[in-house]
């Protein structure tokens, strides 16, 4: 007798998925299917292209001058603690002075539409001093 044949429960057994029927029938409602609430803003992160670098400056003027952009925030704009780590308090919401991985968020753009937010995020100019990857 093999180990697999001795296993009881969900292994080798069909398990009903609660939302499967709605998914395959097209009845599922996803967030993009719902009407937007009045005043909704869309956020897009500006992320580091570097694995490790010092942030020398962040220029947001071009982004904030686009129509429909409500704000471009950096770590300097966060009141209180800039951290989302659940335990050790070492994960900033937005990078401060240094990025430590490709994709490390350095700014967030908030605009009236996702398209405007994406366009504005591309206009944020971050001056980096690349460092050796950690």
Whereabouts are the PLM-identified features?
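Flexible, low-hydrophobicity surface segments
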Residues: 1-134
């Amino acid at each position: 007798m093999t180990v697999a044949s001795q296993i009881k429960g969900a292994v080798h057994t069909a398990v009903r998925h609660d939302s499967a029927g709605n998914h395959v029938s097209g009845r599922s409602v996803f967030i993009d299917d719902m009407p937007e609430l009045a005043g909704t803003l869309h956020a897009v992160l500006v992320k580091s292209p570097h694995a490790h670098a010092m942030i020398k400056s962040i220029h947001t003027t071009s982004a904030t001058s686009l129509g429909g952009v409500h704000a471009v925030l950096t770590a300097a704009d966060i009141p209180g603690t800039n951290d989302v780590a659940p335990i050790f308090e070492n994960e900033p919401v937005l990078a401060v002075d240094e990025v430590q991985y490709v994709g490390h968020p350095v700014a967030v753009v908030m605009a009236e539409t996702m398209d405007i937010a994406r366009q504005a995020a591309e206009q944020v100019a971050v001056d980096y001093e690349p460092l050796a990857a950690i």
